[in-house]
Amino acid sequence: TLIKKTAKGEVDAMKKSDVVLWFEELRREDIPLAGGKCANLGELFGQVGVPVPNGFAVSAKAYQMFLKKTKAEKKIEALIADIDMEDLESLQKASQKIRNLVEGLPMPKDMGNAILSSYGLLCKKVGKKPVAVAVRSSATAEDLPGASFAGQQDTFLNVFERSLLKRVKQCWSSLFTPRAIFYRKEKGFSHSEVLISVAVQEMVFSETSGVMFTIDPVSGDTGKIIINASWGLGEAVVSGQVTPDEYLVDKATLRILDKRVFKKDQQIVSDKKGSTKWVTVPKSKQNKSAVSDATIVRLAKYGVQIENHYGVAQDIEWAVDK
């Protein structure tokens, strides 16, 4: 057991110093290293047996190293110290200056190489060159009770190698939106203790996507699963810009209890320029259910698996690829 302990200690020490951590290496207790999003993607990828697109985290340590190596830390602290928190304009100006600073600094060479070579390895693992990826912020404090940082950091879809490092820096700089700066000040967080990781994940070009709740969010009924679905990429549902179809499933029997299908005339799709756009849904699909009964049951089954693993109700973003 002693040898095992040493080996685990070495692995943990390596984990702590790595710029890149693959999902398969991550577990939910790794939130300090990789943020809530990446740690839980790692847990789902390696432990739960549900299909999760592969990817890696640019670690919180990498962000810390970036600030140190580029000497940005002191400049950021000085800019924050000068803010008059009562004055919105002062807050907005400082936020813009900090974001421009972080995004404008060159990525240290060894760090950039580590991220780009991991992207190359992801292409190999997925068996596609090039692979479009989603680049998403994963804040180390976003899932702390009473400190909801969710929605205050950025997500970039349909990213390729040429803009990957730029998008990583934009995720880092999104820690300094006016709202996030103000929020941390209000809650008494030091800006230097809130680190950010970035998820780089194979992008699923979804025909249909949505959100699933393993408990009825309105009534609180723990025996029901609610699934929302719409055409195209999931941002449309998450942002609340379309009215998705809604399916009600009995958790114990996986029987579909109710289906409410709405007109869905707009969807988000990826475009050739490496971003996304809104398009009109073909007329033949606008009033059609976005998922089949078999898919509804399969999703509900995954929902039960995930809830059982975590021991608490979950809300889960999902996608069905083309």
Where is each model-derived feature located?
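Short, electropositive, low-hydrophobicity segments enriched in small/polar residues
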Residues: 39-40, 46, 59, 155, ...
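N-terminal beta-alpha lobe that positions the nucleotide/phosphoryl donor
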Residues: 2-4, 9-199, 208, 279, ...
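Short loop/turn segments at secondary-structure transitions that flank enzyme active sites
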Residues: 141, 206, 233-235
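Short conserved micro-motifs at the rims of enzyme active sites and ligand-binding pockets
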Residues: 146-148, 211, 236-239
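Segments forming glycine/polar-rich beta-alpha architectures that bind adenosine-containing cofactors
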Residues: 208-209, 215-216
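Conserved catalytic alpha/beta cores of large enzymes that bind or transform nucleotide phosphates
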Residues: 224-315, 320-321
